Amino acid sequence: DIQIPGIKKPTHRDIIIPNWNPNVRTQPWQRFGGNKS
């Protein structure tokens, strides 16, 4: 499991979204980056 302070663990939905949308090339850690202060 991925444990990152201040961020919830990636859910099944977080993982599957980039898979069905070929236009989404953003990596998980980059997507979560907007939530960091």
UniProtKB/Swiss-Prot annotation:
Induction: By bacterial infection. It is found in: Secreted. The keyword Secreted applies. Keywords: Antibiotic, Antimicrobial, Fungicide, Immunity, Innate immunity, Secreted. GO terms for biological process: defense response to fungus; defense response to Gram-positive bacterium; innate immune response; killing of cells of another organism. Its main location: secreted. The keyword Ribosomal protein does not apply. GO terms for cellular component: extracellular space. Hemolymph. Residues 1-37 are annotated as: Disordered. Coiled coil: none annotated. Residues 20-29 have a biased composition (Polar residues). Antimicrobial protein. Has antibacterial activity against the Gram-positive bacterium M.luteus (MIC=55.0 uM). Lacks antibacterial activity against the Gram-positive bacteria B.circulans, and L.monocytogenes, and the Gram-negative bacteria E.coli D31 and E.coli ATCC 25922. Has antifungal activity against P.pastoris (MIC=16.5 uM), Z.marxianus (MIC=16.5 uM), S.pombe (MIC=11.0 uM), and C.wickerhami (MIC=16.5 uM), but lacks antifungal activity against A.niger and C.albidus. This is Proline-rich antimicrobial peptide 1. It comes from Galleria mellonella.
